[in-house]
Amino acid sequence: MADFLKGLPVYNKSNFSRFHADSVCKASNRRPSVYLPTREYPSEQIIVTEKTNILLRYLHQQWDKKNAAKKRDQEQVEIEGENSAPPRKIARTDSQDMNEDT
């Protein structure tokens, strides 16, 4: 092992005291782990990536979720309002008077 360490910038046997050449060979005999799919996918399947930025897509989704509740509440108020209260906008009655003056 001294020949192996010759020429290195630092030579200290205690740095390599736990090194065993036999352990390296045993590790290389192990078979690598392999992914085995559980489902068959058609070979014609086309993977398409979205053009929009991931961050922008996320922000749009969050905005839609946030505003969906507000929109639902607004629609509910409008439905209830139609049944009990008069409409918010009322036709102007003085518009004819203004036209007659000119």
Curated annotation (Swiss-Prot):
Pfam families for the chain: DDA1 (PF10172)
Family: Belongs to the DDA1 family.
Gene behind this protein: DDA1
Organism from which the protein derives: Gallus gallus (Chicken)
Entry function: Functions as a component of numerous distinct DCX (DDB1-CUL4-X-box) E3 ubiquitin-protein ligase complexes which mediate the ubiquitination and subsequent proteasomal degradation of target proteins. In the DCX complexes, acts as a scaffolding subunit required to stabilize the complex.
Alphabetic keyword roster: Ubl conjugation pathway
Assembly mode: Component of numerous DCX (DDB1-CUL4-X-box) E3 ubiquitin-protein ligase complexes which consist of a core of DDB1, cullin-4 (CUL4A or CUL4B), DDA1 and RBX1.
Entry keyword Transferase: no
PANTHER family linked to this entry: DET1- AND DDB1-ASSOCIATED PROTEIN 1 (PTHR31879:SF2)
Single GO cellular component term: Cul4-RING E3 ubiquitin ligase complex
Name the UniProt record assigns to this protein: DET1- and DDB1-associated protein 1
Chain spans, region Disordered: 67-102
